[in-house]
């Protein structure tokens, strides 16, 4: 179905016909490619399957797509690499604010197989120096946001600390007056989805500045 929010051209949501939770796995990649084979002029992606870095609804498997080219799709590969056993697949790190791997090739089965290898490797990856932990206290942190365009894999980590209880790799508290909601698939690809409250707050802020009012005296403006 087409989204009522229409964040971009022909913004659509594809639902799993069976009520099942969000889960990033090999079958996810198969579904993505099945869709873009039917609709080659569309992209299709899946939000991650963990809190904070995932979508707002994790209880039902779904995808988002559309007839639109996001900034991430235009971003170049800054470093190419080859995965052993997949020399026939082009792979590279995308020049993007998030950790993005782009893989491409003519054989979708090979792309699916490599995506599954990358997912499995990332699920268990830990780099303490970079504060990346596969899991802490039994809670898993690593997942990916896959996007197919006839493919980018965005590496995500949802670890939290006392200093950043909503996520280390999430907007920090000093930015929550702008946005504290999940950073999902659409934002990952370069389109900012800001909360509706900002529209009224920005107009209120404009009037307060023009009037020379004390911003700290107004609760809705003091954080700005």
Labelled PLM ranges:
Residues 1-224:
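HIT superfamily nucleotide-processing domains
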């Amino acid at each position: 179905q087409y989204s009522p929010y229409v964040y971009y051209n022909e913004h659509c949501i594809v639902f799993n016909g069976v009520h099942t939770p969000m889960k990033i796995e090999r079958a996810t990649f198969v579904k993505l490619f099945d869709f873009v084979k039917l609709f080659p002029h569309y992209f299709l992606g899946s939000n991650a399957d963990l809190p904070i870095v995932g979508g707002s609804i994790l209880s039902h498997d779904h995808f988002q797509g559309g007839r639109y080219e996001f900034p991430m799709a235009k971003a170049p590969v800054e470093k190419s690499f080859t995965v052993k056993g997949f020399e026939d697949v082009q792979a590279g790190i995308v020049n993007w604010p998030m950790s993005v791997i782009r893989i491409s090739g003519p054989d979708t089965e090979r792309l699916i197989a490599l995506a599954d290898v990358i997912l499995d490797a990332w699920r268990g990856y830990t780099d303490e120096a970079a504060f990346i932990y596969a899991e802490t206290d039994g809670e898993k942190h690593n997942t990916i946001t896959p996007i197919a365009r006839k493919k980018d894999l965005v590496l995500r980590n949802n670890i939290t600390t006392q200093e950043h209880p909503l996520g280390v790799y999430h907007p920090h508290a000093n930015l929550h007056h702008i946005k504290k909601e999940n950073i999902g698939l659409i934002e990952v690809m370069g389109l900012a989805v800001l909360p509706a409250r900002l529209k009224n707050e920005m107009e209120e802020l404009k009037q307060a500045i023009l009037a020379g009012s004390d911003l700290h005296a107004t609760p809705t403006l003091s954080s700005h």
